[in-house]
Amino acid sequence: VVLTVVLALATADLHQQEVRQRFQLLVNERYSRLEERFEDQEQRLGSLRRFFVNSNTVSREEFDGFAQPLLMRARAYAWAPRIFRDQRQAFEQQVSLQRGAPFSIRELNDNGTLLPAGERDEYVPVLYSQTQSLIGSPLGFDLLAQPLRRSTVERAYRSGSIAVSQPMLLVGVEPAYAMGVLLVAPVTRPHTAQMTYNEPYGFVMAVISMRQLVADGLPKPARDNLVMQIVDTSDTQQRVLYESDNAVADSGLEAIRRLTLGDHVYALSLRPSQVFAQANHSAVTSILVMGCLLSLLLSALLYVLVSQRQRAVRLVQQRTGQLHQREYELRGAHGQLRSVLNAATQVAI
């Protein structure tokens, strides 16, 4: 039993080490994949931004031709120019003429319906859009009409680099992919010797669904070894950007990694799922059961051996007693025979 307990403890320790190693391998692989995807989205938006920077003008056909190949794990790419109050009417008329259909700068009302935008000093309406969505593009939607989008545009304007929105419900996206973020990058004219700084004249944008970006290509929840959660640490409310819906295993294992996208930092939390726990169950219980059974068998064997030895000793003692009795009887008979012989000898003499 003691040997069984020692063996079980050693096996349990070895099993824990192996489980931790397997978990770390899965964590490293998942983290590397997500980090690569996040960096890839920044690079794709950066290439679209450079396309505008290096072009005097970009037509809708040119935009579609360049943006369509970029649509990998992104719901849409869009171009939104800056339009001021006194430019609005002429801009809407020009775009309506180019499209051959009415166009207006729009905003969402309280019911989520797009309506003509109210008067403001500045607008950033979506003019071009290349999307995977079957719903279509919300052309004319003003990014400055809603606080979360306005904040993202303003941060991109101030920093001159890619800004990422807080988690939000995306416009023009199927409900299954509606939760996500916007990546916004400012577009300026190339610097010249006379003008080293130019204000952005518009913004390129990537519409990112977290479900598509994170879960695409990964195992189904019922077969995934890891439970994932991505939290926006740049947000004071620590909002959850993505959370898988598979069951968490009863384990103390957890790994937290840092992911960056634009100007936001995310905490990636990874824990083992029940699928992982079932595939890596411990053999300690089996060892204890087998050890106990083996101990019982050895005890039974030892009992049988001892019983047989005691029986053999008793048989030997019994046989020895019988031999001693026989020897005593033979000695008595021998004495009697000698007495008879002696008497016969005397008579003969």
Regions picked out by a protein language model, each given a short descriptive name:
Residues 323-349:
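PAS/LOV and related PAS-like sensory modules
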Residues 271-291:
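Membrane-interface helix-start motif
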